[in-house]
């Protein structure tokens, strides 16, 4: 929060009246954490890894909004914060987070895993061959991400293969967000740019 304390509150946003309100959840919710990799599968939100102050965590939690219930799952294979988590079909793909505490020499893992909605066991996927992946999304049956040098990467879960694609323009290589809308991937709004660019994967062969 604005005092520097790690917050354990949860809020819901209403698109109808542009407002935030606190969610009353059960007492089994996790302790406050940040830089957690998050995704949604079916009717549950998944929170993977993160930090509590100087502590890196490997916890995996789910939150079910319809029942206001938190559930703790099996731990993630490593302690990390940041990283990515996306859903393709009936699998969650996660990893590639930061595994040390020191700034500015942050160390990113190249390891990548997947699990099903029960999150009982994590299966190893192909390691990422590039430099730190800043963000990623699921598009079609692939994972698309942008690395620290502005290159777009595509991961094919079926073949377990990473392939390097185009490099973003120099002015757009500082990436804050990445999302899909109307069959385009939008990338940008980093600390060096206030613009978004659109990327069409069908152009980039």
Feature-to-residue mapping (PLM):
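Kelch-like beta-propeller repeat domains
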Residues: 1-205
């Amino acid at each position: 929060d604005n005092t520097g304390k790690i917050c354990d509150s949860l809020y819901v946003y209403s698109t109808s009246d542009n407002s935030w309100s606190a969610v009353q959840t059960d007492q089994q919710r996790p302790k406050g954490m940040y830089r957690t990799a998050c995704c949604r599968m079916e009717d549950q939100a998944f929170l993977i890894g993160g930090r509590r102050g100087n502590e890196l965590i490997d916890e995996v939690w789910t939150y079910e909004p319809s029942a206001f219930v938190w559930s703790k799952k099996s731990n993630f294979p490593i302690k990390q914060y940041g990283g990515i988590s996306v859903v393709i079909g009936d699998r969650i793909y996660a990893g590639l987070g930061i595994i040390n505490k020191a700034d500015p020499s942050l160390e990113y893992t190249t390891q990548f895993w997947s699990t099903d909605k029960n999150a009982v066991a994590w299966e190893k996927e192909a390691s990422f061959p590039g430099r730190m992946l800043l963000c990623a999304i699921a598009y079609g049956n692939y994972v698309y991400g942008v690395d620290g040098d502005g290159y777009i990467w595509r991961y094919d879960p079926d073949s377990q293969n990473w392939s390097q694609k185009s490099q973003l323009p120099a002015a757009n290589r500082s990436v804050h967000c990445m999302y899909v809308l109307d069959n385009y991937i939008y990338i940008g709004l980093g600390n060096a740019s206030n613009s978004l660019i659109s990327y069409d994967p069908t152009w980039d062969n």
